[in-house]
């Protein structure tokens, strides 16, 4: 699409140059013909030449003269071109007589970029009449991105127009009028809408559906009160006026009643109308101009934000950082999330025996970063940030070579000349450009720091394993203690249930409060149950004397004792 637009623009410029050249040729031919016509004596040869020149002049007059005024001086330069010969002028005029091309390109939005096209002796165009020399102005209504190509035949018919968007209003011959300036009230108040100056009058013609009236600003109240609209000989409030027009169900007189095609809400937004509050007690709201009360204006309700409402600004999230190792053959990427988790996407090796040249580029973000290049690194590793600035313990038992379980030795490459540490999205500095040399003391310090870092990592892993083992042991102990507790509780419940069963009354089954003093094996809840059960229990108890229950003496008559005695 861009290629076609640029081609159209180039074609338009070429055609505009051709049109200008043809116009210049026509003017030169006309001037030559007039100078030759002034000579009184002509020979036969000169007569033939004059006929040819007059014919060329007639052909030239049929050519449409085009004058193009461009906003930029670099588009066209016609002042330094030399005039062609009469023969070339006649040939160009004859070739140009059929079709005239008018090209307008690079139309800007300013008022100075106006292209004026003059059409001479053209017939009527469809919808327009061009008589004599008519100026056609194409102004700001054209699109600023596309070129305009207009092909006009000499018979006056428009053949083709491409890349031209029709203006909102029809184009009329003659100079364009400048845009009308804003009214003084609009410039000062800064209204949102373009109003007629009559909007500031005290009386405004309003309409609701097909009923018209006159709104008096001085009598405007809250809408429900204050009869400010006069229709005929009657006065109505805005709500009554919209109800009379059949819009009572809308309950929004600010949008039902219109002035100049716009609802009254637009006038209220621009501050031209100021309705009163519902609690206003002024003379207009009370429909009594003899009263005088305070005026309370209507204040639009603004929605308040809740306290627990989330803020509109997005919360900045910490993006995961990538540590990419770029060796000669493969690449390994470590992703460090904001929570501290580390994930890898390949194999990693640390060649502790060989000394290689590496370039380390450490970048915190694409916008800012520190570059360390040209360092001699013997061991490649990642230093944990938590150990910076703290003394490291010395472990004499560790050897120079160590193995890490998560990375098998067989799957790891061993010779990688370059190691690059970077973060998302990409490096800003190429890793192959050395910028600063590091002294051997710094390199040895880095080696010691790396060795201590690996020792610290191994110690931390061992401590984590020990902690996990201890946690597992404590878990088993807690589980056993819980099971023992449940067994003890179950046994205590069974014992309590057994005791309750033993202490129940043998007669009624209720909870026993006393027992037999003779055998201490039978329990009773009351003396009534004891007397009732005595007939059966006396054979088991084996006592014929009186029975005492809880220090209560039971006296039995002698006759009964004699009968019961065995």
Swiss-Prot record:
GO CC list? cytoplasm; fibrillar center; nucleoplasm; nucleus; RNA polymerase II transcription regulator complex
Q: Which parts of the sequence carry Phosphoserine?
A: 177, 444, 449
UniProt modification remark: May be phosphorylated by DNA-PK complex in a DNA independent manner (in vitro).
**What does the UniProt entry report for the null mutant?**
Exencephaly and skeletal abnormalities in the rib cage and cervical vertebrae but no presphenoid bone or cranial nerve defects. DEAF1 homozygous mice neonates die 100% of the time and DEAF1 heterozygous mice survived in a 2:1 ratio.
What tissue specificity does the UniProt entry give? Ubiquitously expressed during embryogenesis, with higher expression in regions of the central nervous system, dorsal root ganglia, submandibular gland, epidermis and breast. In 12-week-old NOD mice, expression of isoform 2 is sevenfold higher in lymph node stromal elements than in T-cells and tenfold higher than in B-cells.
Region Interaction with LMO4, as annotated, extends over 404-479
Pro residues composition bias: residue spans: 170-182
> Per UniProt, where does Zn(2+) 1 bind?
505, 508, 525, 529
Keyword terms: Cytoplasm, Developmental protein, DNA-binding, Metal-binding, Neurogenesis, Nucleus, Phosphoprotein, Transcription, Transcription regulation, Zinc, Zinc-finger
Q: Could you tell me which residue ranges the SAND domain spans? A: 194-274
The record's listing under InterPro entries reads: SAND-like_dom_sf, SAND_dom, TF_DEAF-1, Znf_MYND
Transmembrane stretches, by residue range? Answer: none
Q: Where is this motif: Nuclear localization signal?
A: 300-306
Q: Name one GO biological process term.
A: visual learning
Stretch list, region Disordered: 33-62, 163-191
State the Gene Ontology terms under molecular function: DNA-binding transcription repressor activity, RNA polymerase II-specific; RNA polymerase II transcription regulatory region sequence-specific DNA binding; zinc ion binding
On assembly, the entry states: Homodimer. Isoform 1 and isoform 2 may form a heterodimer. May interact with the corepressors NCOR1 and NCRO2. Identified in a complex with XRCC5 and XRCC6. Interacts (via the SAND domain) with the DNA-PK complex subunit XRCC6; the interaction is direct with XRCC6 and may be inhibited by DNA-binding. Interacts with LMO4; LMO4 blocks export from nucleus. Interacts with LMO2 and CLIM2.
Q: Which PANTHER family match?
A: DEFORMED EPIDERMAL AUTOREGULATORY FACTOR 1 HOMOLOG, DEFORMED EPIDERMAL AUTOREGULATORY FACTOR 1 HOMOLOG SUPPRESSIN
What role is this protein assigned? Transcription factor that binds to sequence with multiple copies of 5'-TTC[CG]G-3' present in its own promoter and that of the HNRPA2B1 gene. Down-regulates transcription of these genes. Binds to the retinoic acid response element (RARE) 5'-AGGGTTCACCGAAAGTTCA-3'. Activates the proenkephalin gene independently of promoter binding, probably through protein-protein interaction. Regulates epithelial cell proliferation and side-branching in the mammary gland. Required for neural tube closure and skeletal patterning. Controls the expression of peripheral tissue antigens in pancreatic lymph nodes.
Q: Tell me what this protein is called.
A: Deformed epidermal autoregulatory factor 1 homolog
Taxonomic source organism: Mus musculus (Mouse)
């Amino acid at each position: 699409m861009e290629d076609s637009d640029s081609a159209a623009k180039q074609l338009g410029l070429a055609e505009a140059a051709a049109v200008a050249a043809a116009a210049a040729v026509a003017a030169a031919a006309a001037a030559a013909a007039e100078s030759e016509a002034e000579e009184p004596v002509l020979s036969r040869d000169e007569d033939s030449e004059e006929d040819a020149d007059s014919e060329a002049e007639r052909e030239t007059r049929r050519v449409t003269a085009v004058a193009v005024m461009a906003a930029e001086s670099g588009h066209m330069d016609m002042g330094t071109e030399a005039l062609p010969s009469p023969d070339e002028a006649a040939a160009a005029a004859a070739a140009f007589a059929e079709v005239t091309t008018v090209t307008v390109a690079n139309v800007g939005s300013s008022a100075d970029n106006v292209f004026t096209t003059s059409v001479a002796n053209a017939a009527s165009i469809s919808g327009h009449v061009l008589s004599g020399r008519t100026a056609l102005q194409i102004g700001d209504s054209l699109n600023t991105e596309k070129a305009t190509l207009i092909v006009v035949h000499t018979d006056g018919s428009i053949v083709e127009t491409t890349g031209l968007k029709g203006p909102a209003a029809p184009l009329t011959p003659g100079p364009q009028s400048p845009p009308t300036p804003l009214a003084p009230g609009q410039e000062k108040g800064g209204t949102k809408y373009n109003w007629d100056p009559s909007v500031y009058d005290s009386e405004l013609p309003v309409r609701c559906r097909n009923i018209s009236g006159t709104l008096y600003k001085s009598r405007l109240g809250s809408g429900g009160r204050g009869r400010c609209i006069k229709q005929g000989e009657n006065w109505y409030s805005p709500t009554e006026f919209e109800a009379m027009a059949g819009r009572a169900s809308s309950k929004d007189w600010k949008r039902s009643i219109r002035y100049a095609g716009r609802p009254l809400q637009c006038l209220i937004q621009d501050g031209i109308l100021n309705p009163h509050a519902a609690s206003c007690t002024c003379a207009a709201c009370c429909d009594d101009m003899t009263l005088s009360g305070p005026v309370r204006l209507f204040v639009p309700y603004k929605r308040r934000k809740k306290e627990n409402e989330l803020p509109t600004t997005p919360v900045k999230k910490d993006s995961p950082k990538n540590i990419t190792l770029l060796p000669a053959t493969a690449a390994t990427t470590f992703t460090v999330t904001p929570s501290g988790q580390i994930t890898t996407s390949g194999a990693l090796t640390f060649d502790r025996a060989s000394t290689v040249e590496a370039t380390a580029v450490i970048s915190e973000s694409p916008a800012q970063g520190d570059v360390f290049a040209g360092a001699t690194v013997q061991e490649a590793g990642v230093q944990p940030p938590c150990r910076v600035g703290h003394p490291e313990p010395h472990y004499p038992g560790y050897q120079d070579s160590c193995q890490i379980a998560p990375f098998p030795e067989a799957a790891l490459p061993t010779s990688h000349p370059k190691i690059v540490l970077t973060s998302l999205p990409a490096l800003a500095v190429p890793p192959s450009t050395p910028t600063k040399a590091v002294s051997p003391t710094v390199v040895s310090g880095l080696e010691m720091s790396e060795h201590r870092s690996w020792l610290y990592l191994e110690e931390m892993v061992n401590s984590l394993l020990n902690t996990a083992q201890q946690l597992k042991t404590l878990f088993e102990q807690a589980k056993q203690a819980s099971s023992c507790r449940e067994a003890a509780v179950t046994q205590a419940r069974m014992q309590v249930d057994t005791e309750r069963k033993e202490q129940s009354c043998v007669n009624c089954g209720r909870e026993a409060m006393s027992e037999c003093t003779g055998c201490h094996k039978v329990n009773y809840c009351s003396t009534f149950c004891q007397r009732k059960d005595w007939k059966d229990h006396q054979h088991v108890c084996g006592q014929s004397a009186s029975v005492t229950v809880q220090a209560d003496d039971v006296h039995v008559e002698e006759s009964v004792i004699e009968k019961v005695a065995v």
